């Protein structure tokens, strides 16, 4: 039976490269000289540092620019709150989404069931597997998911015939 998986995975190598390029640009930019503006990545968390919130915004803009140049969708970024750290400095943690959250997986499953297309959607850990009798039905479901769910960058892989 034909099937495919719906996943939400960022290319972490490209994300890491974008963060390193952002750090390099922050180090050379004139408006960041003598400030504590910095960016670092650990696992799937990017941490922005700055002297004020506007500086965090500038660092985030640099990061978004570098991610876009490397063809990484910025919707993978899940911004946290701005936190004050020692003195006048602030930081912000941005998590890189990897995997579909359970609420979104249930929403996708419900969407597929309500479409009346003859396919089954099963939630498997951090992905949703869609199985059907015909390849055309699966392609219709892909189009439906792309059309209805736009706030999260979903991709389809493991297409089996």
Curated annotation (Swiss-Prot):
TM helices/strands, residue ranges: none
Disulfide bridges in this chain: none
GO cellular component, one term: cytosol
Organism: Paracidovorax citrulli (strain AAC00-1) (Acidovorax citrulli)
Key words, A-Z: Nucleotide-binding
Family, similarity comment: Belongs to the YajQ family.
Any one GO molecular function term: nucleotide binding
Top-level taxon of origin: Bacteria
NCBIfam families the UniProt entry points to: PRK05412.1
Lineage, top ranks: Bacteria, Pseudomonadati, Pseudomonadota, Betaproteobacteria, Burkholderiales
Coiled coil: none
Stored CDD domains: YajQ_like
Nucleotide-binding found in the keyword field: yes
Stored InterPro entries: DUF520, UPF0234-like_C, UPF0234_N, YajQ-like_sf
Role according to the record: Nucleotide-binding protein.
Name of a matching Pfam family: DUF520
Protein name in UniProt: Nucleotide-binding protein Aave_1854
Claim: Nucleotide-binding is one of the keywords in the record: yes
